[in-house]
């Protein structure tokens, strides 16, 4: 699959009829579709191939979608949409904490899936595939950290940092208003665009992952994301 220039999507679900349905609608949009029928196969394919997006069922026998997401996130920033059933809100929260970018509730409209896929691919393409040599002006520059918003490119001490679309959006939202404190509810509303009635720990988990990624490149850059105890988070210009 990696030998084509097509947009490649991995569809993961233990139900063959759902895989067929999603394949049919997504191929109409000229996406190249690959399938996995269980979590272990999804992990193997997700780590070996370079997919542009993964549609991932949450509840599967054996290795579930949360574990699949967690293992892929350890190695890659591939955009992931979780497919969940009604009544699985607690598991959806775990999915966000594991690193999923969005979720769709079953039973779903195939057209909604296509729209969500297009929206996430659009954000991901801005983050991952923009030509970094294109001149841009919308750049936030701080000591040890710069954020080129037009290119969706983050560098810490001169080294590019690979972030998921949601991690990037969270960092940029905080950094564009330095020293302003945001509570978790505000961050959920502004960064997670879709309706979400989940656990506020989702924000904490994304902040933790963001700090870890920055810290691997520049501990000074990671310190700029500051916890305001009992309130929320802020981006502190002078923090080093």
From Swiss-Prot:
InterPro entries, alphabetized: CheY-like_superfamily, OmpR/PhoB-type_DNA-bd, Sig_transdc_resp-reg_receiver, WalR-like, WH-like_DNA-bd_sf
PTM entry text: Phosphorylated by ResE.
Keyword Transferase: no
Subcellular compartments: Cytoplasm
All copies of domain Response regulatory, residue ranges: 8-121
DNA-binding region ranges: 137-237
One Pfam match: Response_reg
Top-level lineage group: Bacteria
PROSITE patterns to which the protein is assigned, alphabetical: OMPR_PHOB, RESPONSE_REGULATORY
Modified residues (4-aspartylphosphate): 57
GO biological process, one term: regulation of DNA-templated transcription
CDD domains xrefs: REC_OmpR, trans_reg_C
Subunit description: Interacts with the RNA polymerase core.
Function: Member of the two-component regulatory system ResD/ResE. Required for the expression of resA, ctaA, qcrABC and fnr; activation role in global regulation of aerobic and anaerobic respiration.
Name of this protein: Transcriptional regulatory protein ResD
